[in-house]
Amino acid sequence: MVKLAKTPKNQMKQKKMAPPPKKVEESEEEESSDLEESSGEEVMVPPKKQQKAAVTPAKKAATPAKKAATPAKKAVTPAKKAVATPAKKAVAPSPKKAAVVGKGAKNGKNAKKEESEEEDEDDEDDEEDEDEEEESDEEEEPAVPVKPAAKKSAAAVPAKKPAVVPAKQESEEEEEEDDEEEDEEDDESEDEAMDTTPAPVKKPTPAKATPAKAKAESEDEEDEEDEDEDEEDEDDEEEDEEESEDEKPVKEAPGKRKKEMANKSAPEAKKKKTETPASAFSLFVKNLTPTKDYEELRTAIKEFFGKKNLQVSEVRIGSSKRFGYVDFLSAEDMDKALQLNGKKLMGLEIKLEKAKSKESLKENKKERDARTLFVKNLPYRVTEDEMKNVFENALEVRLVLNKEGSSKGMAYIEFKTEAEAEKALEEKQGTEVDGRAMVIDYTGEKSQQESQKGGGERESKTLIVNNLSYAASEETLQELFKKATSIKMPQNNQGRPKGYAFVEFPTAEDAKEALNSCNNTEIEGRAIRLEFSSPSWQKGNMNARGGFNQQSKTLFVRGLSEDTTEETLRESFEGSISARIVTDRDTGSSKGFGFVDFSSPEDAKAAKEAMEDGEIDGNKVTLDFAKPKGEFQRGGGFGGGFGGRGGRGGRGGGRGGFGGRGGGRGFGGRGGGFRGGRGGGGDHKPQGKKIKFE
């Protein structure tokens, strides 16, 4: 009865470690029969020992041997599966218990105990593998020294004996000693395993039976020799773990720092590359022949300097082919090349000067733009000499050319001072050149500043007369504007008026007075509309008193008859240069609308006013200014798209809108609005995290 009372106690210990078969509780005869069955299982031991002999060197080699043994638990003994769940609190007692069992075996109470002991070692080695797995979990991140790893793999053999002792029920004396030692060792192991307790729960154990069997067959002599080393190795591992945790941030930080430094330094390197010339000995070459191709220009420049025995390392041609950079190998060659300034290259006198850094170029460009005017609506056949005759005080005239070298109808006029440029703009605005009225504007920042002042609000001495009757004459306008010093009425190629005029006054105050007193006055049956002539008007800013607000030279015509041809459409608008009708791709029939192009925005405006409520081929047409490319609203509306007020899309769904990057109607940015979020469900089901702003 004493033994039966002891047995439940041991069974409780076993529940803590590994649930044994229930046969243990019955009687001493059943225990002996269990031992006989276990001795029957011992037939498999000799082949296992052969495997062990082959794998033993790998066990002591390094950590990988340990890792190979880790998955053993599942495959060998199903009853041991539950061993992974207890904390290390129950693992630490293993060394001393192994000693007790070893002694019991050597005393030789009966022959069957010696036979069953080797099977017990199979089980305890399985559990020892779990112990090693706990340690390998701890050791995975830090690099563990080879010596402690080898020690551990050798010393771990006797571990986990307590799970086997209660299952086999050896003797009363051993059980009592085990119980006492367990109580003592539990207290000691708690302190040792406190930090690493959760390790076994983290990793599932895959089934690999072969390495487990090989590792499980270690000898009894190793059990006794390595008892003490087990505890020492645990201390070593804890120290290694603490050191590796301290070292880990230090190791990672330099890598991150290098990456960040590389990212930061990359833009700086690019900046340096673009801001400085490719060579320290570089010359800027102007007045090249734009009609030649890039390769011809490079070859000609190299030959030009090569004749003077000047070595050129590189030639870079600008996009307009009117200028470029020439790099030399030495400062001496660069100085000699400067002496060739004014010499002819491909029939033109080239201008040479030292290349400047980007900073100085920006400063020079600001100053240069302030005294340079941009002129458009020029005849395509105009020459630089003709433009110099118009602008007598011009320092330089540069025509804007296309790739073929022909004029685009635009030019830059540079003056000596900013005052001369301002004077020329006031005097020459609207002046005709070969039947075309010039449109003059400032360049660079000054142009932007003028346009921001608002159309018509900038004080100017010149007024533009819109909606002018074709029957009106300069004398009629002179009678109305008695203080006017100059009146210009642009005409088309046939000599007919274009429907607008420029009226210049002695002072800006006179022009302002005329605008206030004569606006909407009727001339030849039409009410004229007046506004100041300014760059703002050219750019299409809305005047407080009216005027078009689109910078467009194209009219959009709706309501066309199916019989209207492009030729008929073009002839219906005075001053038009081309017309096109939009047709159906499949049938080729007209869709009822088209576009009419003009040479300037003012021509388009005059034609629009002349044809307002007009008819073409019996159909009443509706006119509007065609929007330039890029000025359409991008997306927006229900269903997403690009646009909207709060994010990157419409008012629901898609990629944002009023509710951020996906759905909702809240007024939010990229994180969603009141009903936004990062999903896209529109007003129905906004997905993702809801973010509310209070």
UniProtKB/Swiss-Prot annotation:
Region (Disordered): 1-277, 631-694
Acidic residues: compositionally biased ranges: 26-40, 116-142, 171-194, 218-246
Record-annotated RRM domain positions: 281-357, 371-445, 461-535, 553-628
Entry-linked InterPro entries: Euk_RNA-bind_prot (IPR050502), Nucleolin_RRM1 (IPR034230), Nucleolin_RRM3 (IPR034234), Nucleolin_RRM4 (IPR034235), Nucleotide-bd_a/b_plait_sf (IPR012677), RBD_domain_sf (IPR035979), RRM_dom (IPR000504), RRM_dom_euk (IPR003954)
Main location: nucleus
Post-translational modification: Highly phosphorylated during mitosis.
Keywords, ordered alphabetically: DNA-binding, Methylation, Nucleus, Phosphoprotein, Repeat, RNA-binding
Biased composition (Basic and acidic residues): 681-694
Entry GO terms, CC: nucleolus; spliceosomal complex
Location(s) in or outside the cell: Nucleus, Nucleolus
5 X 7 AA tandem repeats of X-T-P-X-K-K-X: annotated span: 55-90
Low complexity bias spans: 46-108, 143-168, 196-213
Gene Ontology BP terms: positive regulation of mRNA splicing, via spliceosome
Compositionally biased intervals (Gly residues): 633-680
Sequence repeats: 55-61, 62-68, 69-75, 76-82, 84-90
Pfam families hit by this protein: RRM_1
One term of GO molecular function: RNA binding
Ribonucleoprotein keyword on record: no
Modified residues (Phosphoserine): 116, 136, 171
Highest taxon above the source species: Eukaryota
SMART domains: RRM, RRM_1
Protein function: Nucleolin is the major nucleolar protein of growing eukaryotic cells. It is found associated with intranucleolar chromatin and pre-ribosomal particles. It induces chromatin decondensation by binding to histone H1. It is thought to play a role in pre-rRNA transcription and ribosome assembly.
Official protein name in the record: Nucleolin
Chain's gene name: NCL
